[in-house]
């Protein structure tokens, strides 16, 4: 669907089709146009106007069809679609308009009122030809790429992401990601982060049930309260995985996955700020 037809859609249908609001889409177009104006030699005129290029890239993330099928809809070759996707992604990333606050922001949160939630989500990938064991996730039962999310509990803002191969344990991914918290910042994580209190004292994880025993009523209440606070991260995961490129089997080169997930997370934060 080209931009002329997309303009005829209602705001609700446009977001359902693309995964972003019309206001966010227009801002992305403005960012790309500003970058294009900087070029002294624009070169050959592209077949698609900038609005169509951005819409095509968003649809690629949203539907995650092959370049071939996307090209059939837009009247482009596979290579032209690939070049356009890479170009628009690189412009949006380099503009820093959709950058995440980053790990340093966690050290600037001294108050216990700033509660953060940490969790890991997985995206399936095609079975690798080499090093299959490194990507196989026992929890998911398939080959995956892991993404660690650190989220502000009250605002639902994504602060930073970390990435790893499917086999790596959630807690080990945390240690290798370089994420550090200020001493007074309270952190909530799931059972995969058992032992985090040794690194950060103000961390809380659910109480694991002892082998052959049951949890006491107070322990169950404690776990229930933690789950109530950390449910926000599940809602954020759902919002991100509206884009099939993060939820369906990832077919592209793995080194591009981190860039794309950070960009989509930044777009999510931008939309969140619009609602505030």
From Swiss-Prot:
GO BP terms, alphabetized: DNA recombination; transposition
PANTHER family found in the cross-reference section: THAP DOMAIN PROTEIN (PTHR23080)
Binding site for a divalent metal cation: 119, 170, 190, 234
Protein name, as recorded: Probable transposase for insertion sequence element IS702
GO molecular function, one term: DNA binding
Listed cofactors: a divalent metal cation
Family the entry assigns: Belongs to the transposase 11 family.
């Amino acid at each position: 669907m080209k931009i002329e037809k997309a303009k005829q859609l209602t705001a609700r249908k446009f977001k359902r089709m693309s995964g972003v609001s019309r206001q966010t889409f227009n801002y992305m177009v403005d960012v790309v146009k500003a970058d294009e104006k900087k070029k002294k030699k624009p070169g050959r005129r592209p077949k698609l106007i900038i609005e169509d290029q951005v819409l095509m890239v968003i649809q690629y993330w949203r539907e995650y069809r092959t370049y071939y099928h996307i090209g059939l809809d837009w009247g482009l070759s596979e290579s032209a679609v690939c070049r356009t996707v890479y170009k628009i992604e690189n412009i949006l990333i380099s503009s820093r308009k959709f950058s995440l606050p980053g790990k340093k922001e966690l050290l600037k949160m001294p108050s216990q009122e700033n509660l953060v939630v940490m969790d890991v989500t997985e995206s399936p990938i095609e079975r690798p030809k080499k090093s299959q064991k490194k990507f196989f996730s026992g929890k998911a039962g398939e080959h995956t790429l892991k993404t660690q999310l650190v989220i502000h509990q009250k605002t639902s803002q994504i602060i930073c992401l970390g990435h790893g191969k499917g086999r790596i344990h959630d807690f080990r991914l945390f240690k290798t990601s370089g994420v550090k918290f200020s001493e007074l910042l309270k952190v909530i994580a799931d059972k995969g982060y058992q032992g985090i209190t040794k690194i950060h004292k103000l961390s809380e994880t659910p109480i694991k049930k002892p082998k052959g025993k049951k949890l006491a009523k107070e322990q169950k209440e404690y776990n229930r309260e933690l789950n109530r606070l950390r449910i926000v991260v599940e809602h954020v995961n759902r919002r991100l995985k509206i884009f099939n490129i993060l939820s369906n089997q990832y077919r592209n080169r793995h080194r591009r996955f981190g860039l794309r997930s950070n960009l989509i997370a930044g777009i999510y934060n931008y939309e969140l700020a619009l609602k505030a």
